[in-house]
């Protein structure tokens, strides 16, 4: 059932709220290590050099894949969110938790001796903005808690 809280263009043909465009960008931000992994795998010759450029310490690369798991699951389940409503609701909290982990990750690396860089600062700012958006966007929360009638 369509709610009058949101504009009609925010609904698809089945009467479900469409996920906001910014949601997909936040998922890409959260799954950034996964994206790098796919790009490195696709570019066979330069894959190792690319991974070494962004992750000189290979342990950080493998640990960086962990907070991206909820984002990858959200990509995969977004088309089937009506089929798996409980999983979809839990995924919202996992995305929030992953965003907090990613927000703390970079400063933790800095405290452990990694040099501060422009890319690191940009990622921290982007993580702060993403967390605020995930917490405050009413349409996004409504997408995760749609009521079936």
Swiss-Prot record:
Protein name according to UniProt: Inner membrane protein YfeZ
Locations listed in the record: Cell inner membrane
Metal-binding found in the keyword field: no
Periplasmic compartment residues: 40-58, 111-115
Membrane topology: Multi-pass membrane protein
Source organism of this protein record: Escherichia coli (strain K12)
Cytoplasmic side: 1-18, 80-89, 137-149
GO CC, any one term: plasma membrane
Region forming the signal peptide: none
Main subcellular location: membrane
Xref: InterPro entries: DUF2919
Lineage: Bacteria, Pseudomonadati, Pseudomonadota, Gammaproteobacteria, Enterobacterales
Transmembrane segments annotated in the record for this chain: 19-39, 59-79, 90-110, 116-136
Keywords assigned: Cell inner membrane, Cell membrane, Membrane, Transmembrane, Transmembrane helix
